[in-house]
Amino acid sequence: MRVLGIETSCDETGIAVYDDKKGLLSHALYSQVKLHADYGGVVPELASRDHVRKIVPLIRQALADAGMTIEDIDGIAYTKGPGLIGALLVGACVGRALAFSWDKPAIGVHHMEGHLLAPMLEDDVPEFPFLALLVSGGHSMIVGVEGIGRYTVLGESVDDAAGEAFDKTAKLMGLDYPGGPRLSKLAAKGVPNSYRFPRPMTDKPGLNMSFSGLKTFAANTIAAEPKDEQTRANIACAFEEAVVDTLAIKCKRALKQTGYKNLVIAGGVSANTRLRSSLAEMMQGLGGKVYYPRGEFCTDNGAMIAYAGLQRLKAGQVEGLEVKGQPRWPLDTLEPVD
């Protein structure tokens, strides 16, 4: 089965073709980073308009790269939510229209399920069950995964997501958009343990997380300390250490609670080098293994949507004729794939 995947939940237009026998055949991606840089963040209306401009050319490109036409496609998967409603509707409208006009089945995919399953695009894949840490600009959650669609959200951020805290702290430091990767680059120049930031909610039972207070602590530290480059790097390093340690502590607690031996990390923040290194070291000590997608599949992309959609289409799950986007969509409400 060959599935065309369409991702338009935020500020990346991602298109891919995935074959259940041959794997990923093609993927094309357009990022709107330059468009939103002048505003210091994503402007929803501009994001929607840019998706409209880019989506059809990217579909043509992905099909051409795969050596196919739409007639060779067996199904279409598009991101249904969560995300920006205008952006979601662009992908949903195009995906549903193509499916209707070419008489193909279509499925709306949960964006975070796409991230969760992104490591399945690699050669070395995790076996169910496993623990998943999903960390991005909009979400931070720890999920018990028994199978596709069999998810239990064990813990999540009660305020800012980890990626959001990275971006906001970067902005406080005067770093350009996108701030998270720039803050991490600055942190690499810092001296570890120069400052001690709190590890929020790690002294309390449970698996929920909080990062808004950490952002406030960073703001106060930035205001009180010298503004030279090394001090800025040390502060960035301390902030990153605190976020990574908090995530690692919560994951270790969840692994002990569930008895799972393998950990998946996915979402934009999963590309963070310090986070990967810390969790790999932790899992080695626990006798388990950590899995994550390659860098280009950590951020939003069509490949993960094509893969996730294929699993559901093969199970006979299809959308009706309605075009619908879900800005909010709890992950643990998804229908299981038997």
Curated annotation (Swiss-Prot):
Binding site for substrate: L134, V135, S136, G137, G138, D167, G180, N272
Keywords from the UniProt entry: Acyltransferase, Cytoplasm, Iron, Metal-binding, Transferase, tRNA processing
Gene Ontology molecular function, alphabetical: iron ion binding; N(6)-L-threonylcarbamoyladenine synthase activity
Residues given in the record as Fe cation binding sites: H111, H115, D300
Catalytic reactions on record: L-threonylcarbamoyladenylate + adenosine(37) in tRNA = N(6)-L-threonylcarbamoyladenosine(37) in tRNA + AMP + H(+)
Cellular component, GO annotation: cytoplasm
InterPro entries (alphabetical): ATPase_NBD, Gcp-like_dom, KAE1/TsaD, Peptidase_M22_CS, TsaD
Biological processes, Gene Ontology terms: tRNA threonylcarbamoyladenosine modification
Alphabetized Pfam families for the sequence: TsaD
Membrane-spanning residues: none
EC number, UniProt record: 2.3.1.234
Cell compartment(s), UniProt: Cytoplasm
Cofactor(s) required, per the database record: Fe(2+)
Superkingdom of the source species: Bacteria
Cofactor annotation comment: Binds 1 Fe(2+) ion per subunit.
Gene3D superfamilies: 3.30.420.40
Listed PANTHER family: TRNA N6-ADENOSINE THREONYLCARBAMOYLTRANSFERASE, TRNA N6-ADENOSINE THREONYLCARBAMOYLTRANSFERASE, MITOCHONDRIAL
Family affiliation: Belongs to the KAE1 / TsaD family.
Protein function: Required for the formation of a threonylcarbamoyl group on adenosine at position 37 (t(6)A37) in tRNAs that read codons beginning with adenine. Is involved in the transfer of the threonylcarbamoyl moiety of threonylcarbamoyl-AMP (TC-AMP) to the N6 group of A37, together with TsaE and TsaB. TsaD likely plays a direct catalytic role in this reaction.
Protein name: tRNA N6-adenosine threonylcarbamoyltransferase
Gene: tsaD
